[in-house]
Regions:
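Active-site histidine-anchored catalytic micro-motif
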Residues: 89, 94, 98, 104-142
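Short, charged beta->alpha transition segments
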Residues: 75-86, 111-113
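N-terminal glycine-rich anion-binding loop in soluble enzyme alpha/beta folds
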Residues: 13-78
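Residue-level preference for short coil/turn positions at secondary-structure junctions
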Residues: 8-10, 89
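A short helix-to-beta-strand connector/capping loop
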Residues: 10, 29-32, 120-125
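A short glycine/small-residue-enriched secondary-structure motif
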Residues: 53-60, 83, 88, 115
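Short, active-site-adjacent cap segments at secondary-structure transitions
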Residues: 21-22, 102-104
Length: 142
């Protein structure tokens, strides 16, 4: 029989954006669910898959050559689908978000989480609010 700590840890899923400072291998090894940011090179959009489709060095080389490059956040709908897939399994979500001082992703995640909490009342007791507070401990400019 698992001890109490193991049972508690199995009741939630860690979640993050592809902006997290971890490799895809580490994320997958620890069962962390992730949602990708977007980026463009010369008008062609890609999902951030940890540099597998286009290595990060190629993105930066394109910038250096003068290509039109930009990044964009995960939108509310993408966060909603990401969170819904986890909540549908009966799991709570501990999501670590990109800083609200650098991206609108935090706000999009909050909006999606609110909808998920309304649709999955059991999620009211989850760790999501705590995780969202964690990202505010260190200001983006500091």
């Amino acid at each position: 029989m698992p001890n109490r700590k193991e049972v508690l840890l199995s009741e939630y899923v860690l979640s993050c954006c592809s902006t997290v400072d971890l490799t895809r291998e580490k994320i997958e090894a620890h069962g962390i669910k992730w949602v990708p940011f977007h980026y463009e090179i010369d008008g062609k959009e890609y999902l951030d898959d940890f540099g597998e489709t286009i290595p990060y060095d190629d993105f930066y080389a394109a910038m250096a050559k003068g290509s039109a490059t930009k990044t964009s956040q995960v939108n509310v709908g993408e966060f909603y689908e990401h969170f819904k897939a986890i909540a549908s399994e009966g799991k709570d979500i501990l999501h670590i978000s990109f800083s609200s001082g650098l991206s609108g992703a935090y706000g999009s995640a909050e909006i999606a989480a609110k909808t998920i909490r309304e649709e999955f009342p059991r999620a009211q007791r989850n760790c999501y609010r705590f995780a969202m507070r964690v990202v505010r401990i260190r200001p983006a400019h500091g």
